[in-house]
Amino acid sequence: MDHNVSGLNFGEDISGATGSIILNGTDGSSTDAGDNIVFDRTDSGGTDENGNVTLEDGTSGYSVISAPTKTELAGGTDDYALTAGEYESAYDKFEDTESLDINLVLGGRGGGAGDTSSSQDTHVTMLTALVEKRRDCVAFVSPYRSATVGVALSNTATSNVVAAFNLCPSSSYVVFDSAYKYMFDKYNDVFRFVPLNGDTAGLCAFTDQIADSFFSPAGFNRGNVRGAVKLSYNPTKAERDRLYRARINPVVNFPGQGVVLFGDKTALSKPSAFDRINVRRLFLLLEKAIATAAKFQLFEFNDEFTRAQFRNLVEPFLRDIQGRRGITDFSVKADATNNTGEVIDRNEFVADIFIKPARSINFITLNFIAVRTGVSFTEVGG
């Protein structure tokens, strides 16, 4: 390996005796005796024994290693861009409730295969069909990206989000949020906007961990969104009210308090107990647990003994949920009044379970009243 006079570059001339590696350090010639550094493992001509590094004259050249080559793949299809049909085919894989136990479904990109209100409607309709068919999980959806990302005016972003979600179907098994968060992607070493549906689902999982699934995941106690540098848009109070009326849970950056999920509505459009996340998830918990208990009544006799056995399975469980503040009251009915002769002859078993769910506080009213010095509080306070 040659080194030129200036000491900057290596040449390609490599030569030397068999078993030796010679580094020529002067003029590029491998024939000058005494000017080569030789790593000699055969001691074929040096003056020192035992394989030491010696200075000697090489006699035969080594072959030059060829330059590296590269091979490029050709053909194939770049399938990074997904179509709506491919999304639907993927969601169809999760329809089987017996083989797949699912609790939370993350919608990912709000627009699905596109980035418009129309593509969002298509995507949300697919998710709604999935969770309505399963009826044992909740889907979480964010608006399409360009509805809020890069939009200068907060009022315009609110209008975009409301208009997009107005197209989406009503369901108590779906939850809408309002924006994207700006976060650091440590795997690609960049900052990027990410839809908040993953955070909303994560808050539900966090609530399961520190409390119970029938507690609301929103608010300052359990609704703090982690890892958010900023939001794609931060709705004002008036805009939050507008979003909430449209079934959309606003995510808000409160100065000094962080980014907070500030709503716990489901996507159900009509007034109902199931228009709140905690009530829907409470019933998912109850339905899964009690349905598992009910399986053990299959192929038994539909008599008073079996009915009493079922009640004794369910009532302690509901009392436990009541003690953990999930429900205020309940009643289990499985007797001859709802298991009539016709029901028994059809080889069926009927149980009616009445639940009074606990409700979360969405609005607080504080009344401050100034009274005269001589007035008794019992007179003005009732």
Predicted regions and their residues:
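Structured, hydrophobic secondary-structure cores that serve as assembly/anchoring elements
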Residues: 3-382
